[in-house]
């Protein structure tokens, strides 16, 4: 446990809550006093990490609630400026994240996919929790704070995260700083720009998302899109510039309706398991059969593979089932609800 603060870690706790409630007929027994205390802590962290580096009135550096600094020979394993991280501007509505989903330090601290993830989960918490519980003075206060964050983050993403790219047009940047700085890239780990429809921020047909998707899945649009003779996909700085992550191809499948793109991506991930039949963390794009890989059994990616197959069972059954089963309409959520 490294104490690396990531906004998506907080959002994931809310994801777990929302999915529990939505799949168990909104059984509110989980919303205990302990849960409320945890939720209040999340709001406190969001408040603190929404502060700019400099006081807008005096221009002086403000006190910092979170610092991360350590001796390392890897630049992405610590934060600059004495552990503070690079400056962010005020009045953006966005929330800082010191690290990305796989522990690499952010360059510009407003991590866009993480803010999108948090925004969507806060909206669902209002619908799944606050709209259903008995209101008290305390829950009313928490609801008001939640709604303010929803408004602020939504506006912040609209005003700062969408940037006009000289080649790709209006796209979502991976990170921004509120000063006009924007980082054009994507990382395989979720949440990512590629996964924005799954965060609930937008639909996969959204024109800005479509521009963004083309950018991050292009060698000349995303510095971490890696392509070799045997494998291709989005990688990231965590492993290096030779390895793409199967996870990115699974997300590619879930964000398209194109049968050819889906089948090509499925073939890539199935042909690069090094004979183990399991998803790896990353695969060297120049490795035949995926024999040069990291982590032989990466639980996160195996879970994403299972999720992808369930997605195809509902939306594209003809691509994965024999003909006699391909015309069956599958309702996976209903099936799981029956099992639970």
What are these regions (language model features)?
Residues 23-26, 128-131, 135, 315:
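Alpha-solenoid helical repeat scaffolds
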Residues 1-75, 298-313:
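Aromatic-rich carbohydrate-recognition surfaces in CAZymes
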Residues 6-21, 111-126, 184-200, 240-255, ...:
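Well-ordered alpha-helical segments within folded domains of soluble proteins
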Residues 138-181, 200-304, 308-340:
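Non-catalytic carbohydrate-binding regions of carbohydrate-active enzymes
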Residues 34-36, 136, 323:
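Compositionally biased, intrinsically disordered low-complexity segments
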Residues 33, 40-119, 131-132, 140-245:
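Extended ligand-binding clefts on enzyme/binding-domain cores
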Residues 1, 102-109, 289-292:
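Short coil/turn segments at secondary-structure junctions
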